């Protein structure tokens, strides 16, 4: 009998995720959690499911402790992170106990006007998820953009370029260039498919529509009734173009991100000026040392080393470009107002055509 434990079985890698499928009940649970926690934007939860042939099938979810506002400090971040990890492990153990799927495939969060990308919490959390499972996703529900009846949900992953750059943790200009990392390819969006469970589908098919009562009105009477109910004056209520809070908030967020970007650019400009001054001093020192070596060569003396400037001068450290990269990516996200204002622009076009005629 052969010993199978000595065989080196290659580990099979799952293909990259191309689509995310969720059940409608799961989506309703996420919406309820985010709405009940509003206005707290630290609402997060965990996603459970399985990925099959590039399709991530999310079957269930559960809530996690919310993110605190003072969680930026190292102590609070460590304590809150351990509490969430312990809560997640306990919930997964309970799911395993009842025989449910326990594959941890990502997390969800509630956001306001998609103001999530510039937060270090989102990037660090998603990086940790994809480091453990490359097919993990971040599922976003935007409450403000879903207030007018349009369901705004997105599934994101960090791109391989960002994951490779984050692995180095240098975030210098040379690192970003070597990985071809730009603000446009920090994250990638995955298509979402929402469907009903088989039991819900069977229930919907089993429901019967109530019979429509037969009309006793004649055609002439129905026409007279319609004409009598017509309004005397024309109304343009359907062409109301109220901007709403989400558009104003989107502009405010865009202005705040622009101010933060200018601040980061100022820090980078200060570093470049300081670096130029130090390099000028180094060049002057090297020129002076070369002249001194020429005099020593005329006196048949050994030349002095030219790299002693490394002990005398210290070049300023290059600033990390992670914040600038995320802010630029958030600005690109905020400028995509056309995705959120299609109905608003349609009403404007209708008003223009009405007055033009």
UniProtKB/Swiss-Prot annotation:
CDD domains linked to this entry: MPN_eIF3h (cd08065)
Signal peptide (from-to): none
Annotated GO MF terms: deubiquitinase activity; metallopeptidase activity; translation initiation factor activity
Coiled coil regions, renumbered to chain: none
Any Pfam family matching the protein: JAB
Subcellular location: Cytoplasm; Nucleus
Occurrences of domain MPN (ranges): 20-162
Function: Component of the eukaryotic translation initiation factor 3 (eIF-3) complex, which is involved in protein synthesis of a specialized repertoire of mRNAs and, together with other initiation factors, stimulates binding of mRNA and methionyl-tRNAi to the 40S ribosome. The eIF-3 complex specifically targets and initiates translation of a subset of mRNAs involved in cell proliferation.
PANTHER family membership: EUKARYOTIC TRANSLATION INITIATION FACTOR 3 -RELATED
Subunit structure: Component of the eukaryotic translation initiation factor 3 (eIF-3) complex. The eIF-3 complex appears to include tif32/eif3a, SPAC25G10.08/eif3b, tif33/eif3c, SPBC4C3.07/eif3f, tif35/eif3g and sum1/eif3i. This set of common subunits may also associate exclusively with either moe1/eif3d and int6/eif3e, or with SPAC821.05/eif3h and SPAC1751.03/eif3m. The eIF-3 complex may also include SPAC3A12.13c/eif3j.
Family to which this protein belongs: Belongs to the eIF-3 subunit H family.
Name of the featured protein: Eukaryotic translation initiation factor 3 subunit H
